[in-house]
Amino acid sequence: MKSALSFLIAARRSEIAGLQRLALTSELVGAIGRLVHALQRERGLSNLYLGSQGQRWAAERLAQVAQSQALQADVERAFDQLDTDAALSGHRTRLFGRIAYALQGLSALPRLRERVGQRQWGTERTVAAYARLIQALLAVVFEAADSAWDPDISRHLVAFLNFLQGKEFAGQERATGSALFAAGRMDTDSQQRLLHFIESQERCLQVCTDLASPAIRQLWVEAQRPEHLMPLERMRRILCTTPPGGVLDAGHSQAWFDACSRHIDAMKQLEDALAAELQGLCSQRLEATALELAALERMAGGLGAGRPTGTG
């Protein structure tokens, strides 16, 4: 019968394998994060372009598309580096399924851009299409990161993933407000969606700050200083208090987009800090677990050497 020690050794080996997977996927997570950030900006510029009836923002949108395409190539290279021939665990099966779905979304992106460029779609449909693609990419991150048993790492993972989701709600807020200002008129459905995006991002960010380290919380406090958020809050009040059918100043489009972008860019810096902290925790835990495993294996070797052998 196998001893308790043999199962402890197996548990440590399994934990190390999970931590190694998490460490190896950090490059993939970083590449996806950069692409998502670019697509969020592309979505906002697309809505400015559509809301202005194609009269403005065309050049800015195309420049952002080019940047997104370069970052998409980085993500696809990261996907290509994954070993799809190795024996599949349940985790890798789910991860590869998420990647397949994300690649389908990326393959449809040129057609989405074409429809936006030709103004075949409205702003609401465009926001939804980009949101589906971004959610597919974030699902890859969620699955890639879901491989840790250590409670500290798990807590940081929950904080990190909630932050990513909160940032996506901030991106949808930017896109929806961009369309409203560019169109110059408030409508009920868009206003309700805007309120939903604001409330949802605040909820996700609260979960993140509740679980994050003191260093991350301090970074977030700095990003939330009144002088940083005042322009955004002022523009939010305009959008949230203008009655349905009321006129919006299209000249505020640039100010809104810039205020949201400063906020989201600051969030990207915090996202990078969260990812770096998570990677550091993973490395520390990997080193400690490797030492524990080595000690257990020495113990097992000593026990084996001490057993009497048969004389026949």
Language-model region placement:
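Hydrophobic alpha-helical segments
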Residues: 1-312
